[in-house]
UniProtKB/Swiss-Prot annotation:
This is Succinyl-diaminopimelate desuccinylase. Zn(2+) 2 binds at D99, E134, H348. It comes from Klebsiella pneumoniae (strain 342). Its EC number is 3.5.1.18. Belongs to the peptidase M20A family. DapE subfamily.
């Protein structure tokens, strides 16, 4: 017997939607949603396709996700071509199977089943879908959220279908995310010949004590919901490639994943004070890709936990670790935001796959959340 969730997931995987190219995925979803009474508003920005769809009125539960995927890598190393979905030993293989076309299929089928059972549901059910989450994320969910906020759209609850689970579907629910702040720092020196250091000013030597102190700072101890803030140097560049030239500049890029114990302004101030302490000549640029957010126990978390306990008979962990997601933008609307999706063990990897039975289970969980919040 065919399964509508698996069939839709396979149809989506066949569309090679390398970010930000949607490759027809959203048209497929929109067709299904319009067929059950959704109003669909395309919101394209630049090279990115997005849509906002809704059905009903009042208290709003949105399902959010992305149709874009990362590159497949070496296709010859896949057990099957990455955009030709195949099922082996109960596992659905294909780029995007876990991140996150499987979730998208589960959302749409859950909505179809929900509307069939509750054609006159009391609340509003919505979808917020983008084709730019894996790349720059500049013309995707953030732009849709800005548009919705400008016209005072209501959004009470949002379930993001990111692959949150680690071993079995539903074992982990993300009810928040750390903030992400990147510093692009250039230390200025004076280029010269290595044999005449008194005629130059080596920026690497100048920066070394400051960087040593920077990496040893304990920024905070975290709290009940967040691990301690982490700072990692990601890139260091200096020199001409020649062994007889003292470099004129040194570029250092570092990233903070920060908890609710700090603000981005507090981090910036401490870094600048450190630069001043060591009397460095510098240029600095900051990129804040997201503030930390947290959804405490409430209607959405309770509904998601209840759905998982009902179908998988496990109590999920509520965690905030891992990378950022589009939930950071949606949280700006004042919505309760959680992430629930399939197992993430193979995301972005060669032979990405997801248990086909997990997608069927996920669709049931999503439907139960709908029933608890907007039926």
């Amino acid at each position: 017997m065919s399964c509508p969730v698996i069939e839709l997931a396979q149809q989506l995987i066949r569309r090679p939607s390398l970010s930000p190219d949607d490759a027809g995925c959203q048209a497929l979803m929109i067709e299904r949603l319009r067929a059950i009474g959704f109003t669909v508003e395309p919101m394209d920005f630049g090279d990115t396709q997005n849509f906002w769809a809704w059905r009903g009125h009042g208290e709003t539960l949105a399902f959010a996700g992305h149709t874009d995927v990362v590159p497949a890598g070496d296709a010859d190393r896949w057990i099957n071509p990455p955009f030709e979905p195949t099922i082996r030993d109960g596992m659905l293989f294909g780029r995007g199977a876990a991140d996150m076309k499987g979730s998208l299929a589960a959302m749409v089928v859950a909505a179809e089943r929900f509307v069939a059972q509750y054609p006159n549901h009391r609340g509003r059910l919505a979808f917020l879908i983008t084709s730019d989450e894996e790349a720059s994320a500049k013309n995707g969910t953030v732009k849709v959220v800005e548009t919705l906020m400008a016209r005072n759209e209501r959004l009470d609850y949002c379930l993001v279908g990111e692959p949150s689970s680690t071993e079995v579907v539903g074992d982990v629910v993300k009810n928040g995310r750390r903030g992400s702040l990147t510093c692009n720092l250039t230390i200025h020196g004076v280029q010269g010949h290595v044999a005449y250091p008194h005629l130059a000013d080596n920026p690497v030597h100048r920066a070394a004590p400051m960087l040593a102190e920077l990496v040893n700072i304990e920024w905070d101890k975290g709290n009940e919901f967040f691990p301690p803030t982490s700072m990692q140097i990601a890139n260091v560049q200096s020199g001409t490639g020649s062994n007889n030239v003292i470099p004129g500049d040194m570029f250092v890029q570092f990233n903070f994943r920060f908890s609710t114990e700090l603000t981005d302004e507090m981090i910036k101030a401490r870094v600048v004070s450190l630069l001043e302490k060591y009397q460095l000549r510098y240029s600095v640029e900051w990129w804040l890709s997201g503030q930390p957010f947290l959804t405490g126990r409430g209607k959405l978390v309770d509904a998601v936990v209840s759905a998982i306990e009902h179908y998988n008979e496990i109590k999920p962990q509520l965690l905030t670790n891992g990378g950022t997601s589009d939930g950071r933008f949606i949280a700006r609307m004042g919505a309760q935001v959680v992430e629930l999706g399939p197992v993430n063990a193979t995301i972005h990897k060669i032979n990405e796959c997801v248990n086909a039975a997990d997608l069927q289970l996920l669709a049931r969980m999503y439907q139960r959340v709908m029933e608890q919040l907007v039926a």
